[in-house]
Amino acid sequence: MGAKKNLLAELREKSSEELDEFIRDNKKALFALRAEAALQNKVVKTHQFSLYKKSIARALTIKQEKKDRVHG
């Protein structure tokens, strides 16, 4: 649970541009993992799919919170 809190704290400290970069990097990594799973017959660590998706969702949530704080 501590690792998740550290990630959230780090994400909250980032600027909007840094959050965009974090989201882009995680989406690229998720795409690469999906491509690897589809194109190769080797075992892929399937738990990484959900880890990437959750990281993306957390970053998008924090980005929306920052946007609401500025406009709301």
Curated annotation (Swiss-Prot):
Instruction: Name it.
Output: Large ribosomal subunit protein uL29
Q: Which family does the entry's similarity section mention? A: Belongs to the universal ribosomal protein uL29 family.
Q: Which UniProt keywords are present, listed alphabetically?
A: Ribonucleoprotein, Ribosomal protein
Gene assigned in the entry: rpmC
For molecular function, the Gene Ontology terms on record are: structural constituent of ribosome
Organism of provenance: Chlamydia trachomatis serovar D (strain ATCC VR-885 / DSM 19411 / UW-3/Cx)
SUPFAM superfamilies registered for this protein in UniProt: Ribosomal protein L29 (L29p)
* This protein's GO CC annotations: cytosolic large ribosomal subunit
Q: List the GO biological process terms.
A: translation
